[in-house]
Amino acid sequence: MTLEVTFLGTSGAVPTTERNPSSVFVRRNGDAFLFDAGEATQRQMMRYKTGFGVSDVFITHGHGDHVFGLPGLVHTWDFNDRTDPLTIHVPRGLRGDIEDLVFSAGGDVGYPVRITEATPGAVVRSHDDYEVRAFETAHSTASVGYALVEDDRTGRFDRARAEELGVPVGPKFSTLHDGQPVELDDGTVVSPEQVVGDPRPGRTLVYTGDTRPHDPVVSAAEDADLLIHDATFANDASERAAETGHSTAGEAADVATEAGAKALALTHVSSRYAGDASEISAGASGFDGEAFVAHDGLTHEIPFPDAD
């Protein structure tokens, strides 16, 4: 079951020749989303061949480097005769602004577009086996982050134990693994608890958008399999980070450490580090898990916690 992210834009507020403004494409099996949609996001989707089958766009805040790609995307989908509905999730109070941005240049489109406000702590998208939750972040304007959280999975089936109990190889194995008891020919009933292990955790993907280190971010990122965190500045620019509502790489690493995240992606890299993000990378060296500076076009697959 695939869960992967493709970084479409990893720059700070000002793009560079190597980095587009913020956007992350997320694919989970047949579902596809965008986290933020900076300028030229649609071109990045074409460039990195993600496909355009996006059902939801999750906007963290209203700054241009996170939303200026929306009008082009929405109207290109219309030019391509899209009929599937689109939901754009935005922080509270931003619905009218985003509606004006999306439709002021090109007018209405021929498919349903729903703009809904995301309240921190709320589930903003539900699916059979995962959900997307909004959480509070700390930026210079109204902002939220988003966590994609999978449900626990069924425990492992102990075939050897099932055979010891006399369960014949065949359909009864599947019945037990699906959580239903089976009756053997001699009348013995075997329950799932006898042959199926404890539930196994699903995966958690967390995207902060722009933020200072913040306790609600730590809570949302608890045991996350991948935390994508603002790392606009190197550690020697901590005052500038605080002034602008951003984080240093070291602060991102501290959040990841406190949360117990397994992997950390550093993004929203300031243009002052154009061509050389080594200071950003070095700044996160205090994190014991996997840490990397995201770059445009990078695809990262998120494994299950028990994949080994």
UniProtKB/Swiss-Prot annotation:
Zinc phosphodiesterase, which displays some tRNA 3'-processing endonuclease activity. Probably involved in tRNA maturation, by removing a 3'-trailer from precursor tRNA. SMART domains: Lactamase_B. Zn(2+) 2 binds at D65, H66, D210, H268. Belongs to the RNase Z family. Keywords: Endonuclease, Hydrolase, Metal-binding, Nuclease, tRNA processing, Zinc. This is Ribonuclease Z. The active site is at D65 (proton acceptor). SUPFAM superfamilies: Metallo-hydrolase/oxidoreductase. Zn(2+) 1 binds at H61, H63, H139, D210. It comes from Halobacterium salinarum (strain ATCC 700922 / JCM 11081 / NRC-1). Gene3D superfamilies: Ribonuclease Z/Hydroxyacylglutathione hydrolase-like (3.60.15.10). The lineage of its organism: Archaea, Methanobacteriati, Methanobacteriota, Stenosarchaea group, Halobacteria.
